[in-house]
Amino acid sequence: MKKLTKKAENLLLLIWVQAFLALAGSLFYSEVMNYVPCELCWYQRILMYPLVLIYGVAAIKKDISFALPGLFMSGIGLLVSTYHYLVQHVSIFQEVGGACSGSVPCNVIYVNYFGFISIPFMAGVAFLIIFVLHLLILREQGRKA
């Protein structure tokens, strides 16, 4: 285990904050606003929620190697979010999006801030931030070696 630089520690904490905010945001929309998550939303939650624990433990232990699964989960989450966003906003994908097996079709748009920011967009940005910051930590640690 390599000791993290102060910059890497701060980035790791920032990743944890981002994952926590994404978790809190998704719970706000489902529990406070009563928006029922669709099937693709559940997949994104399955990929995001553990990141709070993974990066939290990594930050406490100051060991980025513990968080390696988070890199893969955030990358996969970014792909799922991108697909979900396309299902909501691109006509070719919208026809497919209604085929979600849950009680809520995946092409339902609960929020649409500024005409393009939907829940999958916000999730995708969160996954992207986590993924990029994790790569920056790995790069920072590589420089230190």
UniProtKB/Swiss-Prot annotation:
Organism: Oceanobacillus iheyensis (strain DSM 14371 / CIP 107618 / JCM 11309 / KCTC 3954 / HTE831)
Superkingdom as given in the UniProt entry: Bacteria
Membrane topology summary: Multi-pass membrane protein
GO cellular-component term (any): plasma membrane
Family: Belongs to the DsbB family. BdbC subfamily.
Disulfide bridge positions per record: C38-C41, C100-C106
HAMAP family membership: BdbC
Chief place where the protein resides: membrane
Single GO BP term: protein folding
One GO MF term attached to the UniProt entry: protein-disulfide reductase activity
Function of the protein: Required for disulfide bond formation in some proteins.
Keyword Protein transport: no
Name of protein: Probable disulfide formation protein
SUPFAM superfamilies: DsbB-like (SSF158442)
Cell compartments where the protein resides: Cell membrane
InterPro entries for this protein: DiS_bond_form_DsbB/BdbC (IPR003752), Disulphide_bond_form_BdbC (IPR012187), DsbB-like_sf (IPR023380)
Keyword Transmembrane helix: yes
Transmembrane spans: 9-28, 43-62, 69-86, 115-137
